[in-house]
């Protein structure tokens, strides 16, 4: 029985990458832009029901809720060839339609204002599921709606669905995209630490660099960058949609990658990479060894500078294509012999591999492709940059006027201080994880097992 997942797309960025994600899923499952299953896909062995449901007229509808405080991107989706794909009841745009003004606090307060309407949409989707496993949130942490409204939604998902998993695809910004983004990022990070079970970090800077360096795009468009993101998202869900012997549900996927509850931020790598509209002249033979070796190369990691220092806590390679399992074993041996991956001293130094089918409905230039999902202590470098930028602003109490105008900050700035502490603790946690004595850390502290900052939903597999 498929374990259903509901996708919540919040804000401009969240809806843009969500739109590309659904385009990709439709192509992979043989579903037309109107939601009709193509004749050539009638006998497919895939699990469409994880992310789609069938309406009474049998057309496929995404299990998705689309939220924004301004109408721009939602209207774009409603006017696109995919307009009839979505449930029209699951679009939400605020009545004022004036956005959050790149202000986390305004987005958060708007979330509280419209909580009842949003939860009603989500409840309706949940009631239509036979065995709901959890939620996926797509958003940016830099602006106002994705960060603020997204933060509020994360808290409410924990409150209303405490036993369901929450995974996010969170876009981390380019430098200085928005003046007040250090504030928005720190406030969002607190919720990603406390209220998500797993966060896939989508580093805009690194993804744009990959588009320039590897895809040879001189000036990558937002659509092209989002297409790369959708490729990663789709690949990370292939084991759920084309199930094999392992990692065929969300809890199994997360448990294999998150050894301790707080350290649940993942980086990604993908190879070989191309865009759907880009013809690639193939000059190499893709093998399992070639793909797995390339996934460990810095230039293929979609997180800036994160693996130059530190160690891997876990690696899961999702290999797609017609692959002989004996090739996997030989490839792992070769990689181990070359010692190309540095692991933490207190855990197993192993790369997990999940084999998955490729969609038979998409012509691929390569026989084998791979996605790496990795938990690496070096990811804290991204958090350190955000923390440093935030501290520079707070020293001068710069640009706080619009925050003080909102209910959450009108009396004091305690929420900033609380968020700062959570992020600092996260940075310290990842640094400590590089040391042999990490597993004994805090053993004398009776409250360690009841860390209030640990995600409430984390349930390790026995």
Curated annotation (Swiss-Prot):
Location(s) in or outside the cell: Cytoplasm, Cytoskeleton, Microtubule organizing center, Centrosome
One short Pfam family name for this protein? Tubulin_C
**GO CC annotations?**
centrosome; cytoplasm; gamma-tubulin complex; microtubule
Sequence ranges of Pro residues compositional bias: 453-462
Q: Which domain of life is it from?
A: Eukaryota
Gene Ontology biological process terms in this record: cytoplasmic microtubule organization; microtubule nucleation
- Residue span of region Disordered: 441-462
Q: Describe its function.
A: Tubulin is the major constituent of microtubules. The gamma chain is found at microtubule organizing centers (MTOC) such as the spindle poles or the centrosome, suggesting that it is involved in the minus-end nucleation of microtubule assembly.
Protein's name according to its UniProt entry: Tubulin gamma-2 chain
